[in-house]
Amino acid sequence: MAAKLLFFLLFLVSALSVALAGFEEDNPIRSVTQRPDSIEPAILGVLGSCRHAFHFARFARRYGKSYGSEEEIKKRFGIFVENLAFIRSTNRKDLSYTLGINQFADLTWEEFRTNRLGAAQNCSATAHGNHRFVDGVLPVTRDWREQGIVSPVKDQGSCGSWTFSTTGALEAAYTQLTGSTLSEQQLVDCASAFNNFGCGGLPSQAFEYVKYNGGIDTEQTYPYLGVMGICNFKQENVGVKVIDSINITLGAEDELKHAVGLVRPVSVAFEVVKGFNLYKKGVYSSDTCGRDPMDVNHAVLAVGYGVEDGIPYWLIKNSWGTNWGDNGYFKMELGKNMCGVATCASYPIVAV
């Protein structure tokens, strides 16, 4: 009996080494530890040594997953295998971007869309925006992170991206003046009168709320909870006030590029379609996403632009944590209003 047990353990170690080597090549995941005894035993106990079981166990360990039953383990494993196949088939197409395993690899597209994406309410799209071109030589490339005014990537959880896009733009303007982070939770709790709905909304309306509210509190005094609660705004904790909200003309990437290049980061919204949730690196493009105001379902922050392998791109900060994409950022093809990136763009003018 002891000999059989030893043989089985040696088999598991050998199989694990081979499986992880192949998985690491196609889908690198920084594991907590390389030791076989670190693999989640509950998952392997249910799945045994079936194909991709070790991959899934390592994924679960890496991203701190917790499944409440054997049925849930099997369900999530099945979804994981489907997503892994989708990633590999997409990457074989030699596109300008690649996909990879991340924290969303055990979710169906429908689950992801429900939990992470919203829908446009009253988009800031306008046929005649109020952005003004100012004198200045537009930089060939721009990355506002190099100027130290882009706050760290955060994770919105299952609540609204619009709050993080809004505070990201406000923080960039605020940091140019002072240097601090601002309260997403205040927007979730307090901005409903401006056509924002707790975990759903758009930055343009949020800027209007902050303007007429008399400011937004600092993150330190009003921290993020990720669920809608009772408004707890306190005037004495205001970090920044909005003087005006500037809207980019619908689809006008020249205006957007001018604003990002010479003013500061700009809040933008676009349509996330299947596959983007598993983005890893490169310049993203899609022939299935829309560009109209009612297509957009996710708000982010454009912090720069550049060119990669001959393809112009927007450099954009997301709010799905640093484990997603390129340390929380992604690149979107520039010049085609890809997925509506210039459809609902706006930025604030602030004062302290």
From Swiss-Prot:
Output the InterPro entries linked to this UniProt entry: Papain-like_cys_pep_sf, Pept_asp_AS, Pept_his_AS, Peptidase_C1A, Peptidase_C1A_C, Peptidase_C1A_papain-like, Prot_inhib_I29
The source's superkingdom equals Eukaryota
- Which controlled-vocabulary keywords does the entry list? Chloroplast, Disulfide bond, Glycoprotein, Lyase, Plastid, Transit peptide
Catalytic activity reads: (E)-4-coumarate + H2O = 4-hydroxybenzaldehyde + acetate
- Annotated S-S bridges: 159-199, 190-231, 289-339
Q: Does the keyword Isomerase apply?
A: no
Q: Where in the cell is it found?
A: Plastid, Chloroplast
Activity regulation information from UniProt? Inhibited by ascorbate.
Q: Which GO terms describe its biological process?
A: proteolysis; vanillin biosynthetic process
Quaternary assembly: Forms homodimers, homotrimers and homotetramers.
Job of this protein: Involved in the biosynthesis of vanillin (4-hydroxy-3-methoxy-benzaldehyde) and derivative natural products, key components of vanilla pods flavor. Catalyzes the conversion of (E)-4-coumarate to 4-hydroxybenzaldehyde, a vanillin precursor. Mediates the conversion of ferulic acid to 3-methoxy-4-hydroxybenzaldehyde with a very low efficiency. Cannot use cinnamic, caffeic, sinapic and o-coumaric acids as substrates.
Protein's name in the database = 4-hydroxybenzaldehyde synthase, chloroplastic
Gene name? 4HBS
